[in-house]
Amino acid sequence: YSDERLPFKGELNRLETNYDRLRLQLFQESPVYDSLLDNDLFPEFSNSFLLLIGREKPEIATVYSKFSNERSPEFSLRTDICKEGKKDRFVRKVPTEATAEKHVRNLESLSREMARIYAKEGLELNQCTLEKQGVRLEFLRGKTLEEHLDALVEQGRNEEAEKLLFRYVEKVRRIHSGEAFYKTPEFVKVFGNVSQEGTLSCSGISNIDLVPANILIDNDRISVIDYEWTFRFPIPGNFIIYRMIHYYLESDGKRRALK
């Protein structure tokens, strides 16, 4: 994070952060983080700081950086929000290991393939272009579906939150209802030889991380902002819906009211 990109309320809700030393864990960390953010105290409680000193100011400044390096090396990457002079911001994803280059560069072709499928349900993808180091994506503004749901829950409008969530669940269901699911060797390699009961629906290409935090709403524009975990083989649509509901409800204790 930086002064130009501090965390949003509700963003700090995970406990498995790679801290540099042992720390005490609170019973309800998310409300504590939200309280710190409301009172502009986040810098006072930050874990560590990075200070860059040099004679020349870089043309492209990094205002936020996230390392996803707890994964296997072939998926390890860094996500930056960058600012180029007075121009608008953009997002850059670069591999942190040579073996992850294929995974990162694959995003550009995935964005084109998924855009055609999602357009049927009024969903867009943030545009992705190849760069020398990795890929460059649009920096989009708006509020995530997760933020909209949280606002309703905090106001006690649980029925409205449920209707909003399931409006998007049905979009996902329709996207993944064009084909009958069957296990491919690629599916078994990733998910194992799981048992199958009954007939399941799917599509030929599947983004399993289509969760509320990755759906951005800006007036009439609805965008999917992270499609890194997309596979070019059939995956049951019900599994994607399960992840969508599970990762929203289980990521923050305040959402238990919807269970």
Where in this protein do the model-derived segments appear?
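Catalytic activation segment of kinase domains across protein kinase-like and atypical kinase folds
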Residues: K189-R256
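Conserved structural core of kinase catalytic domains
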Residues: E124-G192
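Short, exposed beta-strand/loop patches in secreted or surface proteins that constitute
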Residues: R78-E84, E124-L130, I215
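ATP-binding glycine-rich loop module of kinase domains
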Residues: S72-A115
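Short, surface-exposed beta-strand-loop junctions and turns on beta-sheet-rich folds
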Residues: A98-T99, K143-T144, T230-R232
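Short acidic-glycine loop/turn motifs at beta-strand connectors
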Residues: K57, G85-K87, D218-R221
